[in-house]
Structures are given as C-alpha cells and as structure tokens.
C-alpha cells in the first residue's frame, strides 16, 4: 500500500512520523485553469524585416498573485508571464508575448502559516506546463520558432519576492545586518 493520497503528497505520518497523526492530509485540487489575458505583438511584421543578422535575445519576467475566493477553501492564483525578444545586435524588438494565466484551486489541510508559500509555489508549478505550451504556440503562430520556456524555480521566485518586501519595509538608515 502506498503512503500517498490522491494529490500525490505523502501522508502526514509518512512525512514526519513523530507528528500528531490527527493532522489532516493536504488536499489540492485544480478546479479550473484559464487565460485571463493574452497579447502577442510581432514587431518584425509591423516594421519590416531587420537588416543584417538577427540574433534573438529573450527575457522572461514572471510575477504571481493569489487571493482567497468567497467559497470555502478556494483560492485564485494568477501567474503573469512577459516574454520579450529583441535582436542582440541592434536591440530592436522582435516580439512581445504577455500572458496572465489563472487557476482556481481547492486547498485543504495546509497550516495557515504555510498557505501563502503553498499557493505561490505549488499552484504555479502545477499550471506551468500549460503556460509553457501557450507561449510556445503563440510564438510559433506569431511567425517565430516556438519558444519553449525553461522551467521556472518558483521557490527561488518566492524567496526573492519575500526578500524584496522585507527590504522595502526596512527604513533607509537601518543597516542590512
């Protein structure tokens, strides 16, 4: 018999045998996923083909947001991706793809102090393969080779955001350590 529940997470007693066995198991269910906003701009088609050699440089920016929904145990998570490509030789824009992708999740059994990181790491991680496919399809349909995004480290992204917020709250005259 397996120590995993339907969501693939190990049962609490398997994770920490010394913990209280009465702690509820984590339950995560994707209720729906959707494109909230999508934009693709092909600068090459608008301005004409660039002269000389084209060496694309691609940058990807990711931001996340989560909020509680009125229904019990339901949360909406929005991941925003901005994929911008420019010519490395003259910095002229090639394309811009912006995607806001959302999901509504049913989450139970996550302690309150761990809920925010859970929503900002695990939920976007589950949605990422769909985001990656949409961006790949959009770049291909926009007249460019398909762009397959590298996996995003949502743990590192979360830590960076927490560090940024902590830094923003620190008074300007207070030393860093």
Swiss-Prot record:
One of its GO terms (molecular function) is unfolded protein binding. SUPFAM superfamilies: SecB-like. Gene3D superfamilies: SecB-like. Its main location: cytoplasm. InterPro entries: SecB, SecB-like_sf. NCBIfam families: PRK05751.1-3, secB. PANTHER family: PROTEIN-EXPORT PROTEIN SECB (PTHR36918:SF1), PTHR36918. Belongs to the SecB family. This is Protein-export protein SecB. It comes from Paracoccus denitrificans (strain Pd 1222). The gene is secB.
